[in-house]
A protein has these predicted regions:
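Beta-strand/loop-alpha-helix module characteristic of Rossmann-like adenine-cofactor folds
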Residues: 2-4, 8-13, 21-24, 31, ...
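Amphipathic, non-membrane alpha-helical segments in soluble helical-bundle scaffolds
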Residues: 149-156, 177-184, 203-210, 229, ...
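Histidine-centered active-site/metal-ligand motif
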Residues: 180, 220, 247
Length: 272
């Protein structure tokens, strides 16, 4: 607002560190307004200095993430991760907490401040200590190197890779010979075992049995993919579309007056 007030009376030069189109929210806000003309003049991106200082090649894949606004599900740990805008201890703590959901406490991360300048500071620390003695600076980034697959076994894509391997040319003979028909009895068996775990109110057992049931879904999906008919993405997409369609009171503008009204509309939608 201050800039827009001043530009009413005079032309302004608004200078930012690095390239104006890189991680500069104020520049984006200025470009969105239509009352005044904005000319963007390029500068050297600080990412160039960052890659040089860290000695990494972005061709291997990297994600550039705003440390003040991101969701854990967006992170691709197979790539180089660079968190920008980590300008104080509170943001560093948020980044650390999110990463600890997926990575071990001792995983190495690198704090880099003022990359490429005479004041450049680089320090590699254990993830669990990322926010300890953090120096406040608006030129600080955090680098997370690519994570090995065995650290990511709780991610869905790793499960998919494992099932593909089991069904692949060098996979398990038992898994490779299975068909939709041969797996039918196992699907039924796993459902009953899940019901028993629920009856016992055993959370650990429920987790295990849900995994066994998911295995059946993954095997059937891989069989479908191997035959060229469908993939797990088709299964997920079909389910997601169905849930959105059958919940117009959540994802649309429909209103419900009672649980009986909800049940009635649900049954009507199922018939279509």
């Amino acid at each position: 607002d201050t800039l827009l007030q001043r530009v009413k009376n005079e032309s302004l030069i608004y200078a930012v560190p690095g390239h104006p189109m890189l991680a500069e929210k104020t520049v984006q806000l200025l470009l969105q307004q239509t009352e005044y003309e904005v000319t963007v003049l390029g500068g050297q991106s600080y990412l160039d200095d960052l890659f040089t200082s860290l000695k990494i090649d972005p061709i291997d894949g990297f994600q550039f993430i705003d440390g003040t606004s991101f969701e854990r599900r967006q992170l691709d740990y197979r790539s180089h991760l660079i968190f920008c805008q980590v300008y104080d201890q509170f943001i560093a703590s948020d980044v650390k907490i999110a990463l600890l959901e997926d990575l071990p406490p001792h995983y190495p991360v690198t704090i880099i401040d003022a990359a490429g300048s005479e004041r450049e500071r680089i320090e590699t620390v254990a993830l669990e200590t990322l926010d300890h003695s953090f120096i406040q600076s608006n030129l600080t980034s955090v680098y997370v190197p690519p994570v090995q697959s065995y650290e990511l076994n709780h991610h869905f894509y790793r499960l998919k890779e494992v099932i593909q391997t089991l069904r692949g040319p060098n996979g398990c003979p038992w898994d490779r010979k299975q068909t939709h028909e041969s797996l039918r009895e196992y699907a039924l068996e796993e459902v009953y075992e899940l019901i028993e775990a629920i009856h016992l109110e055993d959370d650990e057992l429920i987790v295990e049995e849900l995994g066994d049931l998911l295995l059946q879904v993954m095997l059937h999906s891989q069989i479908g993919e191997d035959a060229g008919y469908f993939t797990i993405d088709d299964v997920i997409g079909t389910l997601t579309n169905k849930m959105i369609y059958r919940h117009p009171h959540v994802f649309g503008d429909n209103m419900i007056e009672s649980m009986s009204d909800l049940t009635k509309k649900w049954e009507q939608l199922k018939q279509k």
